Amino acid sequence: MKKKANRLDAIKMIISSKEVGSQEELLQELGQEGFELTQATLSRDLKQLKVAKAASMNGKYVYVLPNDIMYKRVGDQSASEMLMNNGFISLQFSGNIAVIKTRPGYASSMAYDIDNRESDTILGTIAGDDTIMLVLREGATPTAVRHFLSLIIPNIN
């Protein structure tokens, strides 16, 4: 199991420090680190780590880790912060529903971050490619929701 744990740590470090867009690229990086594995094994590892793909700053889709296991990236901003700062377009309310519009490819990762924060205002989210529907708790005001979201999406105000 130690070999697998080391391999999973290597995968997390590579994904956290480089823009990797395919399993083939990741296999090459792992090979340079001394790990020899098949594409099927890598696929299982990525599933276990809950790795997803998200649009990078240059529009290329790259692997990203869920926030609870995110390693420090090289640079001033994490990928999550970059997504939040550059992917958000608008926020609108209607009754107990709010809708966030994003750039294409950004909604899923934003919804993931919203869902993984404790909130007195939001019950949950449903995300598409460029739209997030938020179901608000009874009595949640747009001001309170906007304040909560500003903790996750800095340029929402």
Swiss-Prot record:
GO terms for biological process: L-arginine biosynthetic process; protein complex oligomerization; regulation of arginine biosynthetic process. The keyword Nucleus does not apply. Pathway: Amino-acid biosynthesis; L-arginine biosynthesis [regulation]. One of its GO terms (molecular function) is DNA binding. It is found in: Cytoplasm. InterPro entries: Arg_repress, Arg_repress_C, Arg_repress_C_sf, Arg_repress_DNA-bd, WH-like_DNA-bd_sf, WH_DNA-bd_sf. SUPFAM superfamilies: C-terminal domain of arginine repressor, Winged helix' DNA-binding domain. The keyword Transport does not apply. One of its GO terms (cellular component) is cytoplasm. It comes from the Bacteria. Keywords: Amino-acid biosynthesis, Arginine biosynthesis, Cytoplasm, DNA-binding, Repressor, Transcription, Transcription regulation. Pfam families: Arg_repressor, Arg_repressor_C. Regulates arginine biosynthesis genes. Belongs to the ArgR family. This is Arginine repressor. It comes from Bacteroides fragilis (strain YCH46).
